[in-house]
Amino acid sequence: MAIPGRQYGLILPKKTQQLHPVLQKPSVFGNDSDDDDETSVSESLQREAAKKQAMKQTKLEIQKALAEDATVYEYDSIYDEMQKKKEENNPKLLLGKDRKPKYIHNLLKAVEIRKKEQEKRMEKKIQREREMEKGEFDDKEAFVTSAYKKKLQERAEEEEREKRAAALEACLDVTKQKDLSGFYRHLLNQAVGEEEVPKCSFREARSGIKEEKSRGFSNEVSSKNRIPQEKCILQTDVKVEENPDADSDFDAKSSADDEIEETRVNCRREKVIETPENDFKHHRSQNHSRSPSEERGHSTRHHTKGSRTSRGHEKREDQHQQKQSRDQENHYTDRDYRKERDSHRHREASHRDSHWKRHEQEDKPRARDQRERSDRVWKREKDREKYSQREQERDRQQNDQNRPSEKGEKEEKSKAKEEHMKVRKERYENNDKYRDREKREVGVQSSERNQDRKESSPNSRAKDKFLDQERSNKMRNMAKDKERNQEKPSNSESSLGAKHRLTEEGQEKGKEQERPPEAVSKFAKRNNEETVMSARDRYLARQMARVNAKTYIEKEDD
């Protein structure tokens, strides 16, 4: 049964003490008997009965709560509504949700514009390449995809839109219009009723302006006098606009003209000021000059002439006022004219200054670039001159150093050759074993030389032959020079020496004839300068042949 006066809905239950079931201690011996089974069954039945009773009770409570309020158990929907109200009341969350990007739209537009410009550049590049080809591939078929056709169509539409926008801007822009046709078209549309007449017009604006009340100052001009002044100003403006050469005329005028105009205006002012004072002084002097008797006589006349004098005085005052108004008008017109002229001159001067400044700003970077270029050219020429002078001095110094060293080397080499030839002859004469050993070495060297010749290119072989011939010619010349030098001693010694030489030459010729043609070898002992030089030449020839045969290029070390 439900407890009367119980609340329903979202009610937090109070913490109740949990009832722990009492656990029965097992028996000491641990023997489970039949009595224990019976007790456990009865306990389980009691528990189930208690649960059923509780379920019935809760069902009854639920039914009663629903009967009182149908929305008692709608917890989720109520909670969601509460959260929505919180979010609506919190402005920060609303700003976070409705927040839109500030800059991404402009960036995306800029990206699209750049893409279009890039496509236009690529098309121009392709067009140039086709022009360079000069119709080589006109016979070939051109394959165009549907996407490319679509892109071309879109581009043509965009170009048409841009042209329309440019034409509209040119029509609406006043600076781009050549005549007043656009203005008259607007007037016609307004008259017909296609366009609405603007609310604010010049008349309404003029009527809205309140006229200033005169405050009684002497410098102020009345409203009547203001109208002719405005007319004069308008006339002067029209004259200035009609005369296009007025600017040059104003510039050509000297300071003398300005002084003349100022003197005229000052004279007019002095006349205006002096006229009432002179009239007043003249009237007083006449009164003072009269005697008292005359005053008595004139008193009777004064009444008769009073009306006349008063009328004349009024006329004078009217004339004086008219003169003052005219002078003031002239003064104001002159002043306005001078102001306009000065402002026009000032505008011209400022325009010239701005024009000159603009030209100077444009000329500055050009002059700077020209100076930098001239400095670079001058530096290059100077460096070249310095470099050429240094090279010439270096070459001279090297030549001066090499000349004496070359002379000394030649002398030393010639001496060494002579000594070596002497030693060699003595060895040949004294030792036959040395000759046999040298023959063997020469044979081995000649065989190696032939192998190298076979391996080397035909160019190197031809060079080797030519060098061998030169070497043999030099040897003969050296032998002849030695013979001439040895003929100078006494006749007895010369006769004996001649016989000895003849015998030696005969022996050497026989030996040379006995030697095979391979006797001359590149590996023969290098005992003089000629043989050393020929070996160098052969080595260089072999290197050149190898370089020519190579398919690649080796990097040269500095």
Curated annotation (Swiss-Prot):
There is a cross-link at K199, K210, K281 (Glycyl lysine isopeptide (Lys-Gly) (interchain with G-Cter in SUMO2)). The modification Phosphothreonine is found at T275. The modification Phosphoserine is found at S27, S33, S248, S254, S255, S457. One of its GO terms (biological process) is in utero embryonic development. Residues 216-226 have a biased composition (Polar residues). InterPro entries: NRP1_C, Nsrp1, NSRP1_N. GO terms for molecular function: mRNA binding; RNA binding. Residues 299-310 have a biased composition (Basic residues). Residues 21-54, 204-534 are annotated as: Disordered. Residues 204-215, 250-280, 311-442, 449-487, 501-517 have a biased composition (Basic and acidic residues). Residues 106-170 are annotated as: Necessary for alternative splicing activity. Keywords: Coiled coil, Disease variant, Epilepsy, Intellectual disability, Isopeptide bond, mRNA processing, mRNA splicing, Nucleus, Phosphoprotein, RNA-binding, Ubl conjugation. Expressed in dendritic cells, T-cells, B-cells and natural killer cells. Expressed in secondary lymphoid organs such as spleen and mesenteric, axillary and brachial lymph nodes. GO terms for cellular component: nuclear speck; nucleoplasm; nucleus; ribonucleoprotein complex. It is found in: Nucleus; Nucleus speckle. Interacts (via C-terminus) with SRSF1. Interacts (via C-terminus) with SRSF2. Belongs to the NSRP1 family. It is linked to Neurodevelopmental disorder with spasticity, seizures, and brain abnormalities: An autosomal recessive disorder characterized by developmental delay apparent in infancy, impaired intellectual development with poor or absent speech, epilepsy, variable microcephaly, hypotonia, and spastic cerebral palsy. Brain abnormalities include simplified gyral pattern, defects of the operculum, and vermian hypoplasia. Death in early childhood may occur. RNA-binding protein that mediates pre-mRNA alternative splicing regulation. This is Nuclear speckle splicing regulatory protein 1. It comes from Homo sapiens.
